[in-house]
């Protein structure tokens, strides 16, 4: 299947996803959209992050390092690099890759959690994840050792 199936999309809001909705996207290729409430929540949370960075606030993992480096302030010009390095440090795993339906389910679950508006993710990032689901662009996800964090 090269695209989503025709019909109404599943609007995710971070609160109302059920097993039937998950299966319709994962197994049947149903399209996904973001509910207006999710867009608003994600935008509001992102503004909190942007405001904290603009104020020079100390925010763990945003303007500081992680773990034993939590007390290390990261210069503003290196904040993107910090986040990229975090992704790189978590991109390892072993085992056979998950199948397409399992991967789509994980992608939808991640999008749904981000749609709650608690993580500070950019709306554009969440929109791209939804677009990847809809265009059936799936990462290879190892069955063991993969890390998922908000």
Functional labels for PLM-detected ranges:
Residues 1-150:
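Conserved, well-structured ligand/cofactor-binding cores
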């Amino acid at each position: 299947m090269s695209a989503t199936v025709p019909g109404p999309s599943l609007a995710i809001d971070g609160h109302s996803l059920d097993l039937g909705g998950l299966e319709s996207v994962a197994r049947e290729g149903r399209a996904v959209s973001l509910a207006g409430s999710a867009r608003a929540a994600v935008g509001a949370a992102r503004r909190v992050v942007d405001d904290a960075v603009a104020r020079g606030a100390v925010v763990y993992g945003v303007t500081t390092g992680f773990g034993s480096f939590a007390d290390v302030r990261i210069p503003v010009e290196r904040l993107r690099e910090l986040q990229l390095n975090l992704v790189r440090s978590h991109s390892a795993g072993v085992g056979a890759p998950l199948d397409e339906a399992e991967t789509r389910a994980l992608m939808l679950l991640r999008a749904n959690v981000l749609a709650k508006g608690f993580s500070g993710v950019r709306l554009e990032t969440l929109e791209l994840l939804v677009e990847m689901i809809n265009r059936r662009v799936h990462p290879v996800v190892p069955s063991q050792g993969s890390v998922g964090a908000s």
